[in-house]
Amino acid sequence: MAPGALVISAYAVCPDVTATVTPDLKCPNERGSLLWVQLSPGRHRLGGSALAQVFAQLGDSCPDLDEPGSLESAFNVTQELLKERVLTAGHDVSDGGFLGCVLEMAFAGNCGVTVSVPAPPPGVT
């Protein structure tokens, strides 16, 4: 946590505590898939992030949500995947982007990672 950082927490009822995940990366048989759910595709805003801090910068554009409906859809899909026990871990990308997220998950899971990111299809940013 960065000096001067504000921590905000929230509480929500969890009807089934067994249908939850933690941020530590778990890869049975040393294989797995990471899903990056972009709530604002094409907008890679890292202002105020750990990545900006590493480079002694503040950044000029902090993470934001352009279309609230995308958050609702992603939340609902995530809840279904949790019920189906498909997800094994979860983490946000707001504090350093995709790379920061993967590193934090690997550190928490006490494991290394090899990541292959395919090129996006034409027209997707």
Regions found by a protein language model. Give the residues of each.
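Phosphate/diphosphate-binding loops
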Residues: 1-44, 115-125
